Amino acid sequence: MKLTLHGHDDRYAVEQLQLSLFPDNTEGEAVSSLHRGKVWLTAVTKITVNGTTAAATRRIKAADETVRLRRRALQQSYYLAAKQLLPVTPPWGALAGVRPTKITTKHLLEGGTPKSADELLRDVYYVTDDRRRLAVDCSVSTVRAVNMLQPSDLSLYVGIPFCPTRCTYCSFVSRTIGRKTELLEPYLRALEQEIAVTGRLLYRDSAKETVLTSNFRLFSVN
């Protein structure tokens, strides 16, 4: 789908949402415009697919403009226009290119409640009921785990370069497994070896009491 911008250059913010909502190279055109007034900053999106055009508008106060709020308004207007042309409501709403729990976990860590996190996903990102419950439940568990960490603990991130399928909100999946399932087992074996080696490097009884000592609880290396 062709994407044209007027009045702004936030292409990535709009394009990643377009890739999520219209992933199959849909024939059509989308125009994302930003109009600056003295009081309001107005985002307008018009999308034409198969001869049918839909439009939507979102605005923020010009005095409140930040990069985040501007991009949010652009994405909201795009989503609300696209929703009118889609056969089903996207379960993850206007989310694109992010982990849904990243938003809700950050909200909870900053003092928000599960209820306000749910409202954030509903009112800002238009996420459906069941997906909101899933995201908030995951974030509550994440925050609980974070609060259990001690000074001698360590949180390790393991990157996975492929996914079983492409999530509906994702605009940058590295690679779906597809016909490459034969690579899964050797990759997991290599990953297990790397985790074991990393564990041995972190688990040093002779070191002082840091994350490199026997007090480190998240690894158990044989």
Show where each model-derived region lies.
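Canonical Radical SAM [4Fe-4S] cluster-binding loop centered on the CxxxCxxC motif
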Residues: 153-188
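Short secondary-structure boundary motifs at beta->alpha junctions and helix caps
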Residues: 53-75, 85
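Amphipathic beta-strand/beta-sheet edge segments enriched in Tyr/Trp
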Residues: 31-62
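Conserved SAM/AdoMet-binding glycine-rich loop
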Residues: 193-222
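A non-catalytic, amphipathic alpha-helix used as a structural packing/dimerization or gating element
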Residues: 77, 186-197
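N-terminal [4Fe-4S]-dependent radical SAM core
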Residues: 86-92, 109-156
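Short Lys/Arg-enriched alpha/beta "domain-start" segment
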Residues: 1-31
